[in-house]
Amino acid sequence: MLSLNQALEEMLGQLPAPSSTETLPLNQCANRILAEDIFSPIDVPSFDNSAMDGYALRFEDLEKFADFRVIGKSFAGNPFTGQIQAGECVRIMTGAMIPAGADVVIMQEQAETVADDRIRFNAQPKLGANIRRVGEDVKQGALVLAKGSKLNVASLPLLASLGIAHVSVFSRLKVAILSTGDELTSVGEPLEAGKIYDTNRFTVRLLLEKLNCEILDYDILSDDPALFEKTFSEAQAASDVLITSGGVSVGEADFTKAVLEKLGKVNFWKIAMKPGKPFAFGQLGKTWFFGLPGNPVSALVTFYQLVQPALAKLSGLNAQGIANLTSNLTACAATNLKKAVGRQDFQRGFYYLDEQGNLMVKAVGMQGSHIFSAFYESNCFIVLEAERGNVTAGEKVTIQPFNALLS
């Protein structure tokens, strides 16, 4: 069996970057992936302006004059248009253009009125103090955002500050989803004896919505090979990606692998991880296939660890963005952790700082692949290496805090 890292490397190496793009206004670009490099068309700020409410004057005059004549005011959007001469100053507001001749701003708290139009200063600022220079934030022609960057509440306002109203983004992925099994009942329907609710399709839909995918829902497939083949063919024609839940184990009614081999290609089938061993990756023509396990915890863990970076690659996110989807920290185990040697284990945990400021983590609930309730009280995965056995409280372990997908 492949390790998780081997599976990720093989999968990401096969998946192509997208080619389809569209141009959209900024207000429609949240969580989209940029399809072009963006260079600044202007300097930001585009003019020297004041960082403080205060007075603008000539730095050289501070050693020549005891007090200064106030000759006008400069407001943001309504600048002073004259020229400052020796012994003069201009009342200036934050963000206002620096008047011609001025090269320092003294904040108003360091000024004292000595007459109706005269000010004395009790400060010795440096040349250029409290002045924001042209291009100090962004210089004209500088690379602002690289192709493959995710557009969000940090990057979109930056583009707006440059006056950029439209950008080219990669088209949204069309993702088909379905669940398999005669035992499944749609959420909201009456539950018959021996049936369970289709939690996984509901969960996958939520995750795909957060990833800004276009979702094609093929509902629940009964255990019928002919129906599998028909639905897989329809999904292949309509989508970029097909994600199934269930049907990837070794039971008599698990038809997914057989149909995938008939219509397409199985790239790998099992991974040495727990939960999530029966995970499938393959192709149906131009459509990429991901087969999640039927157990709810296994399905969510494999989606998070494998499908999430795969969809990011297919959506156009750059390599650094994909690497940043997960991050690992070292914490001290606050509880004993049960672990068998052989597979990498992702246990649900809760990390926190103790009274001494140490990063601690404790296991949350039962760790079975069918125990979904533990996720609700968790904020991280406790990642235990394949060769590691039981962990005793006090030992160091690796944790992986949940990213925004699970928050």
Regions found by a protein language model. Give the residues of each.
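Short, glycine/charged-enriched hinge/interface segments at domain edges or termini
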Residues: 2, 13-15, 55-217, 360, ...
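Solvent-exposed alpha-helices and their adjacent loops that cap or buttress functional pockets
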Residues: 48-50, 61-63, 81-85, 98, ...
